[in-house]
Amino acid sequence: MEPAAREIENRLREKRQARALSQKQLADLAGITRQAVSALESNLYSPATSVALQLARALRCRVEDLFSLKQGGDIIEGELLSVIPQGDGPVRAQVTQIAGRILVRPLHGLGELASLSAAADGLIIESNPAISRVKVRLLRDREALHRKIVVGGCDPAMFLASEYVRKHEPDNLVPCLMGSSFALAALKRGEIHVAGVHLADESSGTWNLLDLKQSLGDMDCIVVTFAYWEEGFIVRRGNPKKINTVSDTAKPTVRIVNRERGSGARRLLDQQLAASRISSSRLKGYGDEVFSHLEVASRIKAGLADTGIGVRAAASIAGLDFVPLQRERYDLVIPRDYYETLHGLKILLDTIVSRPFRDELDALGGYDTREIGKVVEMPR
């Protein structure tokens, strides 16, 4: 019986690159496909004896120079999607498999909440910054990697959804905190399964669809409404700085915390400033950026800022007050082939329309779930 890939120490990529060969060139020399070389280098499966011999002959080395049995531990190689924090020792990471690619995200890059609450899939033990590849020692069964559904977006309710999904399939849903524009870009690059977006088009008064067309082009996607929510100013209890309009954020005594460029919250603030003809340079803290609604609320609760744009639910969770500015639609954007074929997505979509989940979402405050699960047509 051939040993499983997780039992193999794989040095194929290292040897190929040492001979300055592309995957296609090595595949031609060994008489196999480029896709097979890619899969072997990612350690997705162990090579048959005949294939190992052909590769060794093509690279002019011994089979044991390419493949050997591990002494223990399950090592996998993948693409690094964000920066590894400085410091010594292994780095906690989430590992997912999307369309055959192994994608590695250090937990610190998923936001404070995910970093503290999510269990790591593995530990990054070796990296090559020149090619953005890392080796990860897995802390769980690699068979679970392809079952994960990665949702990029900024809705804190995705963490609640992941807990509901966990009842049906453990560790199935991976929320990755990122702004709407970043989520669409990640979806286009094939780095996530679902993008959560809330982007207003001022000229048409519509939500999300024009941005989807501009960002995704002809990519065939299904758009599913998650909820309508309220977005506005998160403020301290009692609103001591009397922040009620965007003009109040320009007061000399007020400090804001901002969201990153490309997020729906940042777009709302900039639209409000432009409408009131206020320069962003007048706002203390305009350049102080965080990457989620919950981080905005956390900064305000800690006294590091007086206000910031966020959703009512984030204010409620943090025990803060809220000044509404507008009602928005939050949509889930899903490539059609994922929508039709991935079992994990069916679990997610069934979960969000279930009565217990909707009741709890309503209890958070600021969500209107009456259209949850509704499919919205993308413009052609």
Language-model regions: role of each:
Residues 163, 181-195, 199-200, 289-304, ...:
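Short helices/loops that flank or line small-molecule/ion binding pockets
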Residues 2-7, 14, 22-25, 33-35, ...:
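N-terminal hydrophobic or amphipathic helices and topogenic motifs
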Residues 217-230, 320-350, 369-378:
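Periplasmic-binding protein-like
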Residues 196-213, 297-326:
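A ligand-binding cleft/hinge motif common to bilobed small-molecule-binding domains
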Residues 226, 235-256:
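Flexible hinge/capping segments at coil-to-helix
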Residues 144-154, 247-266:
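Short loop->beta-strand "edge-of-pocket" segments that line small-molecule binding or catalytic clefts
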Residues 172-179, 280-292:
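Short beta-strand-to-loop elements that line the ligand-binding cleft
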Residues 160-169, 247, 261, 265-285:
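Ligand-binding cleft/hinge of the Venus flytrap
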